[in-house]
C-alpha cells in the first residue's frame, strides 16, 4: 500500500480584526452611500469577504444587500472597467 502524504493547510491571514461599522456606531447601511460600498468591492467587482475586511456577520449581510441593490439601480458597476 502506498504511503499517504499529509498536506499542511496554509494559514489564513486576517487583515482587520474589528468591524468598521460597529466601531463607528453605524446602525443602517444605505445603498445610496456609494463610497462605503466601493470600499468593500475589489478590483474585479466582487464583494470582499468578511474574513478579509473583518466585518461582522450582521453588517456583512446588510452590506451585500446594499451592494446588490446599488448594482441593480446602476449606481455601481457589476464589473471593473475593462481597459483596452
From Swiss-Prot:
Function of the protein: Binds as a heterodimer with protein bS6 to the central domain of the 16S rRNA, where it helps stabilize the platform of the 30S subunit.
Xref: PANTHER family: 30S RIBOSOMAL PROTEIN S18 (PTHR13479), SMALL RIBOSOMAL SUBUNIT PROTEIN BS18M (PTHR13479:SF40)
An example molecular function term from Gene Ontology annotations: small ribosomal subunit rRNA binding
Family to which this protein belongs: Belongs to the bacterial ribosomal protein bS18 family.
InterPro entries noted in UniProt: Ribosomal_bS18, Ribosomal_bS18_sf
Keywords: Ribonucleoprotein, Ribosomal protein, RNA-binding, rRNA-binding
Record-level GO cellular component terms: cytosolic small ribosomal subunit
Species the sequence originates in: Vesicomyosocius okutanii subsp. Calyptogena okutanii (strain HA)
HAMAP family, per database record: Ribosomal_bS18
Gene Ontology BP annotations: translation
Record text on subunit structure and interactions: Part of the 30S ribosomal subunit. Forms a tight heterodimer with protein bS6.
Pfam families the record matches: Ribosomal_S18 (PF01084)
Gene name, Swiss-Prot/TrEMBL: rpsR
UniProt name for this protein: Small ribosomal subunit protein bS18
Amino acid at each position: 500500500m502506498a504511503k499517504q502524504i499529509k498536506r499542511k493547510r496554509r494559514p489564513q491571514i486576517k487583515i482587520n480584526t474589528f468591524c468598521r461599522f460597529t466601531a463607528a456606531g453605524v446602525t443602517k447601511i444605505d445603498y445610496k452611500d456609494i463610497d462605503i460600498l466601493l470600499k468593500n468591492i475589489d478590483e474585479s467587482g466582487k464583494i470582499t469577504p468578511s474574513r478579509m475586511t473583518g466585518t461582522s456577520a450582521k453588517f456583512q449581510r446588510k452590506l451585500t444587500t446594499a451592494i446588490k441593490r446599488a448594482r441593480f439601480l446602476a449606481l455601481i458597476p457589476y464589473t471593473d472597467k475593462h481597459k483596452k
